[in-house]
Amino acid sequence: MADLILNIPTGEVSLSAATAKTVFSMTAPANQRLKLKGVELFFKGVSATDTPVKCELSLVTTDGGTATTATPAKNDNDMAETAQGVYKTNYSLEPSIYGANLRTWEVHPQTGLVLYFPLHDEPRLKGGTEMALRLTAAQAQTVAVNAVVEE
């Protein structure tokens, strides 16, 4: 890895009640690994009685979904390298097959989650594979996600 740290914001994404939605995905280039350094989730819930949102970080075996391309921003603008990964957000058609679930969190929609993985324990993605963050809310919610990725 070239120590190219990228910040990838999704903007606000609407979640429908009781429907899983992929809010962020990253695909590694064919011969390069990616490392997910951290993830931040911020909800706009207003009810204290809403059910926590299930957040799943999973491998995707077949994408096949329709999404918006997310534009990564370099942490250090002096680095000449260009981001090689493919980053997507706000899927309107879900990926067809999800693989192994790497992590699951339950987060109350009046709060958020700021998680930076411990050194050497970051989820790694081998070349040509995809990882995604899928959320399921019992009530309709709005979320903004920021991912920090190392290429």
Residues covered by each model-derived region:
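Beta-strand-centric surfaces of beta-sandwich/beta-rich domains
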Residues: M1-E151
